Amino acid sequence: MKLSISRRIVRWPALAALVACAAIVVPNVNGQTTQTVTVTSTVPGVLSLGIDTNAVSIPFLAGDYSPSTGLATKVVAGANTLAVTSNKSWTVNLKANTAAFSFVPSAGDPDPAKPAGNFSYKVSTAGAYTAITTSNVVVKTGSKGGTATAGNTFIMDYQLTSNLAQDPPGTYTLAIIYTLTAP
């Protein structure tokens, strides 16, 4: 019996030595290493003004004029739709390019220098019309976002007055300028 006990005692130290050697020789498979990656992106300033048409006609007919005063007023509701895309808060300004309409006479009349202020505008959802000037006037302000952002798409109404005593027959043209800024 002593023989079998001594064999067991000899086997355990040999097994312990074998495990110790394996720990030294076998690499640690449970190790871990990390690396950090920095992602960089540059976002440009986005500022875009779209308009549905660059030409609006406001023709007067003989029946538009008051027989007693000779005055006429024409309104074009929904004359222009403007759409803003911006990643900053924005402002749209409006002004006339010149102080008077250009004039091409129908019958050789002299240029009456029809004032630009005979043309008025308003945002469709606003109250009264405002006579245009040659100075930038704030028409609308809005929030950053696309054209689907509330308030970033809006409609403009136009109004033009005429007076038989001052406006000879012909074609009157006025350039109006919308300017989008992001302060």
Which positions does each model-derived feature cover?
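Residue-level detector of alpha-helical transmembrane segments in integral membrane proteins
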Residues: 6, 20-21, 52
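N-terminal small/polar-rich segments of proteins
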Residues: 27-114, 137-183
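Short beta-strand segments and strand-loop junctions that repeat across beta-rich extracellular domains
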Residues: 117-128
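Cleavable N-terminal signal peptides
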Residues: 17-19, 29
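Bacterial N-terminal signal peptides that target proteins for export
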Residues: 2-16
